[in-house]
UniProtKB/Swiss-Prot annotation:
Alphabetical keyword list: Metal-binding
Organism expressing this protein natively: Borreliella burgdorferi (strain ATCC 35210 / DSM 4680 / CIP 102532 / B31)
GO-annotated cellular components: cytoplasm
Subunit-structure text: Homohexamer.
Protein name: GTP cyclohydrolase 1 type 2 homolog
Amino acid sequence: MNVRDLSFKLNSIFDINKYEHIDKNLNGLQVGNINAKVNKVAFAVDASFSTLKEAKGNDFLITHHGIFWSKKERIVSNMYDKTKFLIENNLALYSVHLPMDAHSVYSHSKVFSDFLGLKNSFAFANYGGVNLGIIADSVFSFSEILEKIKKENKHILFSKKFKESVNKVAIVSGSGYSFFEEALCHDVDLFITGDTSHQIYSLAEEFGVNLIFAGHYFTETFGLIKLMEDFKIQEDLEVKFICKNTNL
């Protein structure tokens, strides 16, 4: 398999062309020699310079947040340094942002809900015609759900319990607080997202909806890790997840 083959495979899985009109991220192959062989693939949330350095020695890096966020970015300053590093180390960079958020299998929100043991999930959180979140049924209490998350991530930004019983949960990974009012329409008992938001606290209190702001980084690891695990099983590739938790 070469860079072109793997890029085409990912383009097909995530149907990236569908998102050109709504996603600021430049989805797909951002940097790479399309004819280079791929044996080792790394996965990471962000294409920070520290991530690129740790990915050195791999042939292909898949990130949720790439280095190009428009089709007109200039390759200067730190962008020049990152691009130069990728080229000099023959490391291809592939980014998949909203196409992963909205994916039926690899959505961070969907995989997160599976991790929590939630059932009967359906998509919500409409953004530009695609759904970025999940609503699912719960048989667990608020305390049980919070404890399960804390076992994986000690740096939960904020949580607030208004009631212990949780029958329905809404999850939107990353910065999903703007979908809180849509979640209210589904009578959820718990709303989970990454980033904190002062503006939804009063609404949550008034409607008795529990809140967990579990961290932007943490909530956007789930789909990547599932994709990595599937690649390890389905493809003859060596895989690695690069953890650079910002605790935010």
